[in-house]
Amino acid sequence: MDTVTIGAKGISVSLDLAVGHIAGMEVEADGRVLKPLHRAPWVGSPRESLPENLPEGTVRLSGDFLCAPFSASDVEAAPLHGWSANSAWDVVENGAIAGGWRAVFRLRRKVMGATIDKVFTLRDGHPFLYQEHVFSGGSGAISVAHHPMTVMQGGGRLAFSPKRVAVTPATPLEPDPARGRFMLAYPARASDLTRFPLAAGGATDLTDYRAEDRREDFITLVEADHGGPGWTAIARRAEQDLVLVLKNPAELPITMLWFSNGGRDYAPWSGRHIGVLGIEDGRTAIGHAASLGDNWLKHEGVATAFALAEGRSVSFRHVIGAAPLAGGEPPSSVESAPDRLRVVTAGGAARELSFDGGFLRIGRSVPA
């Protein structure tokens, strides 16, 4: 596998250049090595052991990757989640910067005529990967999402920045009981994340990832207006750590959750993709055409694509991090300061992590 690994004090990240997926991320803290991101169990298996028609991005499914577009490429022909998640990236820059390391990768293919750069920055002593994607030129509009995945051996608890509403699509990912299973009601919506409708009746707590619930479920969370960074925190029980995913809601106004816990019985999933949660921050509906057309998010006042044009560029930023955590309870709030991230528990105890508070550009204008 053609991977590039970059590092700074206390952190390293590897990128699989064949598909632009993060192949590994390690954070050193309190004498431990934390691994916040997931890799599918079939990665590295002989290609002939996997279904012939599998997109390359599923063959090498790992870590986080750029979806451009998210889901179906039904405007410009490409595999699921676009060429950005299924084809080769080149190293454009890779070197030390003051107090850290920076690498720039470029997608060989163009998307809607645009050149795409992926920028990784690591800082000494910061337990975070700082990412930026830059689209230069092109025409039309593109929907986008990050696709970070974490995995829990014994389940975990989730917490979020304020959300306006949670909505499931019209149909589940796996409607055929011969192929898989799901738990949530489709379509459904709720403003209380701790009481979301179940297909079987009643309600479930979306903030409780239970290891025993075998299912594939997909739900979209719409950010509320709160003026701070958007964040998702996952307190992983068995791993005794906290995984943090942060965004600028003006750039990426929704967070899509993919609960993948042994809910697909067909290859290559085969009931072995267990304990996985995708935290997919995006500016998208489900599919490129849906994102450009009329969709329910637009009716909620939520943008679902970035406009592209020759002579201009658009970009968005994203952060993934990890820290040790005993007790398994996620934070009640996450607050950004210029040089640190303050993680506050329900009991009021605070922990501070070294953080570039200006990176996410909160409060600054974003192109349409």
What are these regions (language model features)?
Residues V134-G138:
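Asparagine-centered strand-capping/turn motif at beta-strand->loop junctions
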Residues M1-Y130, A141-A368:
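Surface-exposed acidic/polar loop and edge beta-strand patches at domain peripheries
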